[in-house]
Design a protein with these regions (language model features):
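A structural boundary/capping signal
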Residues: 1-157
Length: 157
């Protein structure tokens, strides 16, 4: 198993356990995990991968049939695709057989469905106070949410 697959699987398991225990009730969007959590999840996964010296960028793509719907996943410097929330589309946009709960490797059907107007964006740094962007060098609302969620899942990693 690759380092990317090990870390992605470990994070997905931690998120599933925390969600199953109701620990995300007050942390939108994680209260609906994996639905609507792709971008925040990528921030956390990007942080964990960076801890292992694996640099990633987020790929943010629009749905080919409705550009108001978007999905986000990671791509490493070597071009490896990592997506641990594509199962949110199972039974709706994708057949169950086309979904991997932890995708590490090539693009799958989910990424192909969200291929319109793709944008590369950096991961949000939430774990380094030198990177806080709100007034008085405090974490911005997104960074605060990521800090809160990471504290919840850290015990399951």
């Amino acid at each position: 198993m690759t380092v990317e697959k090990r870390i992605a699987t470990k994070l997905r398991c931690a998120l599933d356990v925390a969600h199953g225990k109701g620990e995300f009730v007050k942390y939108w969007p994680f209260s609906r995990f994996p639905y609507d959590c792709c971008e925040h999840t990528c921030d956390i996964l990007g942080y964990l991968l960076l801890e292992e010296n694996i640099n990633t960028i987020q790929i943010n793509g629009a749905y080919i049939k409705d550009p108001t719907r978007r999905h986000v996943w990671l791509k490493t410097e070597k071009g490896v695709i990592i997506d641990i929330t594509e199962d949110q589309f199972a039974g709706e946009l994708l057949d169950e057989k086309d979904v991997e709960i932890v995708r590490v490797g090539m693009e799958g059907q989910a990424q192909k469905l969200f291929s319109k107007n793709r944008v590369e964006q950096p991961n949000t740094v939430f774990n380094d106070s030198r990177e806080y962007t709100d007034f008085g060098n405090c974490p911005n609302p997104r960074q605060k949410r990521l800090i809160e969620v990471f504290k919840v899942i850290e015990k399951y990693l």
